[in-house]
């Protein structure tokens, strides 16, 4: 069930039972697959100058896969690996009621970007706080590597120009 897609955060209303009513099943692979495809298509349709420099996909689940019809574990792992290797996407996996690290491993998600949590209001608050820290760290790490790359590029550019 997709409730919000590419909405500015200030336009997103808090989830309530009138907006989101859990069904008791978890089509985890379908949710991930559709999100990756939709995000990829949205990015490809943008002008190059408008494309995001960093894509972080957060997966939050309170149940194990038990209802997907379009995607399977192998296909999702391949999709995630492709986006990580070819486009440097970051995937964060937050899961309750399962071995989050074992599930993340089967999906090709880095264990450093994985958290397990208790399926309770307190557990959810705690993992979302951890998630905020993880996103800040990813952004900081990305900015540092971009700065390093630009500094290296400038150094090489200056070295090449000094040869002329």
List PLM regions with ranges:
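Acidic, low-complexity intrinsically disordered regions
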Residues: 1-164
């Amino acid at each position: 069930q997709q409730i919000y897609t590419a909405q500015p955060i200030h336009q997103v209303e808090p989830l309530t039972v009138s907006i989101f009513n859990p069904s008791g099943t978890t089509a985890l692979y379908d949710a991930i697959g559709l999100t990756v495809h939709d995000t990829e298509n949205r990015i490809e349709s943008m002008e190059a100058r408008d494309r995001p420099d960093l894509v972080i996909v957060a997966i939050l689940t309170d149940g194990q896969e038990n209802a997907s019809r379009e995607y399977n574990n192998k296909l999702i792992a391949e999709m995630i690996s492709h986006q990580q290797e070819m486009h440097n996407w970051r995937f964060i996996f937050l899961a309750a009621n399962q071995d989050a690290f074992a599930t993340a491993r089967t999906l090709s998600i880095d264990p450093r970007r994985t958290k397990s949590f208790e399926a309770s209001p307190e557990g959810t608050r705690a993992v979302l706080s951890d998630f905020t820290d993880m996103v800040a760290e990813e952004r900081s790490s990305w900015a540092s590597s971009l700065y390093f790359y630009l500094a290296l590029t400038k150094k090489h550019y200056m070295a090449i120009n000094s040869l002329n």
